[in-house]
Structure formats: C-alpha cells, structure tokens
Amino acid sequence: ENNCYLSHCYFGKRIRRWNEAAKMYYYDRGFCANPDETDRTFSLDTMPGEYPDFGQGDFRSPAMELEFQDGDRNTRFHYAGYQISAGKLSPEKLPHVYVESDKEAMTLEIWMKDEVRGLRLSLYYTIYEDAVLTRFVSIKNESEDIVKIHRLLSMSLDLGEQDYDILTLGGAHTEEKN
C-alpha cells in the first residue's frame, strides 16, 4: 500500500466480488514506528504485512533475516512488479506438488527489491482448481557482497484477531500424521 510496502487484505475462501470492507484505514498510529516521519497514519507494525523484513519498525517476527558482510541485518524490500502465468512454477531441487496440465493451476509471482543491498525477492503463489494454495520464496543476490541467510520462510501469514480453530499435525520422518 504505502510507499510500495506489500500487504494483504483478505485470506479465506474464494470471493466472487471484492468488498472494500477489508481495505486498510489510515489514522494516527500513536506510538507505533513510522517509516516516514511526516506521516503518523501509517506503520509497518500495524499493517497486515505480506512478507515482513527485519529492522524497519515492524516488531513482529520477520519472514526473513539476512546478515551482510558489514554485520548489518536490516533490509528494506519494496514492491517491484508481478506476473501471472498458467500452470505451476516449481522451486529448483526441492520437493513440490505437480500438475498434469497448465489448466489445473495459476501462479502469481511478486517481485520485491532491496535497492540498497542489491537483492531481489520473488514470492510465488499457486492456486489450484481445488482451491489449494501453495507458496514458496526465492531470493537472488544481484550484488558482489556475501549474504548470510539466517531465516527465509515460505510464507508469513498475518491474521487479524478472530476466534480461530488451530489444527496441528505432528510427526517425525516417515511418521507424519496425514
């Protein structure tokens, strides 16, 4: 939304028409950190962040933590573009689900860039005919610097307060509960 930060406004069952009720509202955020000191109505700490990075005033757990050669860990990824394609893109050399035809799925790829550090982050969302969503992330270092990855999650899901039921399926290697 603001300054090319990526947020989401809905996560749930399929919707036929967009409803403005889920849009983000701007009002004075009080003591929240603001990326723009002249705008008190926007804070990363209160925005439903799609893929939060480290050190920018969002005090929730980040989806990624990187360390640069100078010891700095701050990143500042901004929205850079997107592409929608038929079928499913697959992470290289990693297990994944497959489709037999490109008609079975659609993939959204969102690009984020950290211009200061020379990094490109790609977020992949594949939705299947049966309303299943899969996600993965890739990062590309376009600089000459060495970057150490401490944390790089496939997704971050920032849900508002509601009465949720949580189901967890514990297991171990070859003993998964499914």
Regions found by a protein language model. Name each.
Residues 3-178:
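Polysaccharide-binding surfaces and accessory modules of carbohydrate-active proteins
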